[in-house]
Amino acid sequence: MNKLELQKIANEVRKGIVTSVHSAKAGHPGGSLSAADIYTYLYFEEMNIDPQNPDAPDRDRFVLSKGHTTPGYYSVLAQRGFFPVEDLVTFRHVGSYLQGHPCMQHIPGVDMSSGSLGQGISAAVGMAISAKLTNDDYRVYTLLGDGEIQEGQVWEAAMLAGHRKLDNLVVIVDNNGLQIDGNIADVNSPYPIDKKFEAFNFHVINIDGHDFEQIAAAFKEARETKGQPTAIIAKTIKGKDVSFMENQASWHGTAPNDEQYAIAMEDLKKVEEALCQK
């Protein structure tokens, strides 16, 4: 799949994010939009998965550690064929299987229930250790928020991953620079993120999280890295491609009203039109 095809899918993922949060009148659009390109590459290029057989023993595993950003997660799962795209409008509705945090018992393609920040990476480390103990070839991927890494449990898990030399584990940090309280550097700065992971024996790669060429190169490098887990620090834009949401902490956990929804969808339509002209 080429760069343009991936960009078009990522734009569809972003449409699903905006649509689901608007329908629910609740949710977390900012950090979902910032991670849409990472989600797209993982599910359409990187991971060994089969939507027709989501529990295949040899599948790669993904853990959404920043579990509140389900609008992006559900949107890419729907685009990949795990369930109908039309179901996204039931997000957070009473009786829907698509609730605010992912549930592995109810949603096809979800490998781990998550939500409490800091816990997802621990589950991912456990999965990676399990694969090593059973000599299985599957790889484990986990997506963290940059605000999330203020949680101490993240670093306990990172310490163990580095100690166990889990080269089948890839940690991705969505570094959009903002959390619900504002700029992460002002709230409780985790910088330098790369040096912290290096201190725990991680191979670290810094990338532009919206550049598919850099994303592809990073995951290729991670596959070639032996004897160390990999941390990909992806610099991203919170609210990416929605004009009034970009780089605004206020859109961490706010749903657009009808007027804002129309503007957001028009923004994404313009992105689509620009991509179609390439």
Protein language model annotation of sequence segments:
Residues Y74-S75, C103, Q153-W155, D181-A185, ...:
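Short acidic, glycine/serine/threonine-rich loops at helix termini
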Residues F212-K278:
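Glycine/aspartate-rich loop-and-adjacent alpha/beta segment that forms the canonical ThDP
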Residues I17-V21, S32-H163:
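Cofactor-binding active-site loop characterized by glycine-rich and histidine/acidic residues
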Residues A10-A26, D174-N176:
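N-terminal capping segment at the start of a domain
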Residues R80, V187, E246-S250:
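Short secondary-structure boundary/capping segments
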Residues M1-V13:
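N-terminal hydrophobic or amphipathic helices/low-complexity stretches enriched
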Residues H68-T69, Y73, N176-G177, D211, ...:
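Glycine-rich beta-alpha junction loops
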Residues G109, S113-S116, I121-T225:
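Thiamine diphosphate
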